[in-house]
Amino acid sequence: MISDDFDISGFSLKEDELVPTTGIKINLNVKDSIENKSAFRFVDATASKNANLDNLIVSSGTTDEENPDNSTYKEYELNPKFDKDTLNYELELLENIDELNLKPILSDTKSSMKLKKPKRDEDGNLVYESDGVIVEYEELDIQNNVSTTVKLNELGKGDTNLTITVTAEDGKTEKNYTLVVKRPYGVIRGSIFLKPMESKKIYKATVRLYKSDEVKNVIDWSTVKSGKRDSIHQQLEKITSLDSDTNDDGTFEIYVTPGTYDILLDREGYLDHIFISRTINNGDVLDVGEKELYAGDVNKDGVIQLLDLSMLYSAYQTDTTSANYDKKIDFNDDGRIQLLDLSALKANYEVNRIIE
């Protein structure tokens, strides 16, 4: 006979009238007992100690059921592969996305969950402790089999550490599942100045990054000839790009996921400067140096010539109050199209776009 103690505090007794009588008497404690001619059965009311997850689905994008071709939904495989008894996971993300969706699936639906994630302010910026280095965290309740969107730390700002705490029905048993989202990155930096606007201290431009493989589907760079008018700029506008404005002094430093990129230095009314097929590995720093952007390519066809001059003359001596004022011809940003703009275009006449 087994003499080990057995906790029956979570059990109750219920009379069962559908089975033969037994005449057994059960003493629950000194005062209470059950004695009945009919049989009885135990009812287990013990709270569950199951604090397991059956699965953790990490995804991005959305599903379009009406037009599946428009769906962007994608699931990611964790390292190691998910198992209820494995508590620590990593995900290396090689995409330029800002958010991930977490969908935890409970083993016991009577359990509850909380998600601990980096804290952000109303503008979506990371909140740091008083030392300005350590990131603050916050907790929120999350639901079983429901996706929760998590904003990721920006490239260069460290891993995104997430913890899902599962509390069993008994309120005591807990399991902490951690997910560390790693975002490898490299850096592209450089500076630009606008010719001939150096004396005006005008440096602002936009740096546009394109995945080289996507550009190759649209543009064959081997066929592009210097000094020939083309629609390269307009074709690039149709391709998804990662855009960053330069600082006020023309410098820029952009964090990117490893890959091969085409880089466009762009400002309205100025000749483009393009770099093609630049590969960035994890930890790389690509410095493109200081580059000039030349005022005068009003129609963005890669050459400053007669068509641009004609467009300037058509808006000559107009200002921001005029109906035909065109900001892209106002090269020095003074709100007027006049002699300074004409002089800038003539100084750069017949200059061609540069592709490196």
PLM region spans:
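Acidic, divalent-cation-chelating loop motifs in proteins
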Residues: A295-N299, D326-N332
